Amino acid sequence: MSAETGEKVVELLIPLEMYLQHGVHIGTKMVTNYMKRFVYKRRNIDGLAILDVRKIDQRIRVAAKFLSRFEPEKIMVVSVRQYGHKPVTMFAQFTGAKPVIGRFVPGTLTNPALEVYYEPDVILVTDTRMDQQAIVEAAEIGIPVVAICDTDNKTENVDLIIPGNNKGRKSLALLYWLLTRQVLVERGQLSPDAPEDQPAPVSEFETKVKMV
């Protein structure tokens, strides 16, 4: 309980330092009206918007609880953005979700004649701009959309926003690692007190950059 406000202080899922080290809170210079409520402040040195870590943490809890209500194979997780490919693949591996990485083929959710056609009950997207096709199709067939949204994202047709830096590879690794853990916790498949290397270390969720 906070002595100043009388509000109950909820402990973060992971240490604050871990969020900060992975840059999950670092937004962009642009802030859309949709994302203003998640911004903590602007950084004086460069004008970047800083997301409120407590709101990120709280939305991860809410999203994990929501996703855990669906059959694993009925969850589709999407990332056109390259830095989201490995995190999405790992999330799918441990949760049983259907991963779609790279180009999202138009009609994936709406055209049964396509080989890639799939019928999820919910989709999780990495970036509302990059994954717009998936969001449009989800809205067309009437299924909920959970989205990781940076400060510059628009959120039309998004049912549940997870604020966070969706451009950095370390940030996306941590966000998907934490979502994975929380979904498993909500399903009763992982203890809330499980070590940080379960179900796998966060480093294994990170897209590796090939040196040329």
From Swiss-Prot:
One GO term (biological process): translation
Domain of life: Archaea
InterPro entries referenced in this protein's UniProt entry, alphabetically: Ribosomal_uS2, Ribosomal_uS2_arc, Ribosomal_uS2_CS, Ribosomal_uS2_euk/arc, Ribosomal_uS2_flav_dom_sf
PROSITE patterns: RIBOSOMAL_S2_2 (PS00963)
GO CC, any one term: small ribosomal subunit
Disordered: annotated segments: 190-212
Pfam families: Ribosomal_S2 (PF00318)
Keyword line: Ribonucleoprotein, Ribosomal protein
NCBIfam families for the chain: uS2_euk_arch
Annotated family: Belongs to the universal ribosomal protein uS2 family.
This protein's name: Small ribosomal subunit protein uS2
Origin organism lineage: Archaea, Thermoproteota, Thermoprotei, Desulfurococcales, Desulfurococcaceae
